[in-house]
């Protein structure tokens, strides 16, 4: 893939697009189809097999918006709801590594990525941590339906 035929990667901040290309090469079919729709402001349901890039298909545009200042940090901007705590923990892990890579790309270019916190909340989340989330909300909250109902 050359710089002239990146397609949907052109939607993203150049540092995020370059990071993605370096880390993953070309976008998957799911990502190619999802990103323009998400960037256009539409609601999207992504259903695809494991390992097809769903997590970044769903989250990368929001991360881009936080990174560029289009969405101000300091409150929940991206909400992911799943009934499975194990899946929520996997999603969190699968977001932290890309965020580290994107942050490194920004630092290498002499820029600072705004703080983007990714936290999970479930019935098992200690009360002290829930209170801390209320005082200092994460930009990305991954939660269960039961916990969302209590927020």
Outline where the language-model segments fall.
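Compositionally biased, low-hydrophobicity segments enriched in charged and small polar residues
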Residues: 1-3, 128
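Dynamic helix-loop-helix/coil hinge segments at AAA+ ATPase domain boundaries and subdomain interfaces
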Residues: 3-29
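Conserved P-loop/Walker A NTP-binding site and adjacent catalytic elements of P-loop NTPases
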Residues: 17, 24-151
């Amino acid at each position: 893939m050359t710089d002239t035929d990146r397609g949907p990667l052109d939607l993203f901040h150049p540092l995020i697009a370059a990071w993605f290309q370096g880390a993953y090469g070309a976008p998957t079919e799911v990502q190619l189809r999802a990103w323009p729709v998400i960037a256009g402001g539409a609601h999207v349901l992504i259903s695809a097999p494991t390992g097809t890039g769903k997590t970044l298909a769903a989250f990368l545009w929001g991360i881009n918006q936080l990174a560029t200042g289009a969405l101000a940090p300091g409150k929940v901007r991206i909400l992911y709801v799943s009934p499975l705590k194990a899946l929520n923990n996997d999603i969190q892990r699968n977001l932290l590594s890309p965020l580290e890579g994107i942050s490194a790309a920004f630092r290498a270019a002499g820029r600072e990525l705004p703080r983007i916190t990714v936290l999970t909340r479930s019935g098992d989340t200690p009360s002290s941590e829930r209170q801390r989330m209320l005082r200092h909300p994460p930009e990305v909250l991954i939660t269960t339906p039961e916990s969302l109902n209590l927020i």
